[in-house]
Amino acid sequence: MTVSLVKYDGTPDSIRRAVELCNGFENLGKNHRVLIKPNNCFRHNTMPPYGMVTTTTVVEAVVQLLLEHGCRDISIGEGAIINIFDELDPYTKHGFRGTGLDRVARKHGVKLVDLNRGPFREVDLGGISVRVAREAMKADFLINLPVLKTHFQTKVSLGFKNLKGCLSPDSKKRFHTSKRLDRLISLLNDAVRSDLVLIDGIYMLEKGPETLAGKAYRKDLIIAGRDVFECDVVGATILGVDPAEIDYLSEFAGRHRRSFDLAAIGTVGEELESLKEQLEWRFEPDQELLGPTKITGLSAPHPGQTLCSACGATLALALSMLGKDNPETDFGG
């Protein structure tokens, strides 16, 4: 297959060209049940959205293309992290409102689906039972819309990892507590197939996945393809991360005999070499969140892969607020 690389010019035409160059709608029927899965995992006013969540203009452009194609059964689905601010307000809906996806849905007559609420289907991933939203499993055509960002646990968070949003909340936690995060991400992409992947690279994020410690850079790039492995290999390469060193991609490549050879994958549009960056994915809470505040006597070690996104966001917010309210404080007693 082919991965398209298109510079974003601020109009829907960029998205259209990216889809056309990779023949993204080749297998899409007008009567297909379509699910758009953006990365809208969390949204809060203290966290700038740039590089963290899928840009609303990209989602809307995809909706418009689907309607032009003749599709009418279109849903936008996400399962955001547990709401750590107000348990009475489902956080997925909070995210839809915060990013304007609720407005897009009303404007174009498409459905919004909270994947956290199920119903779910039990799926076995290498001996570990997880629950996947039935909405994702029954879709005839799944459009995977991740962001071009790094991740302090998995090096990158692109198409493969974006499908974690299709899991039930308890299954998301199980991915981390099982101590097999990368393998489970790999296996999940066998159970839930992406028919089109479109990586939103309008911004790219260093030291992700959130923007309290992470830094967003304007990139104005759209990456599109019909093979999630190829798109993630190209996306990781652009971020400056060796895709062969990403464990869930290596797991998948070994199981399916896939190659990391970029020449074999093939790209069209912009020249890949000219797009390469060197972003840092490593993130140490001690240095990034406590260091600038000159707080002493307190330690926040790297949690490894055992911390889920909800807990990670909570930790980042808590440390950020602690540092803001207690600069240069010695907690050592």
Task: Please name every model-derived segment.
Residues M1-G333:
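N-terminal and secondary-structure boundary signal
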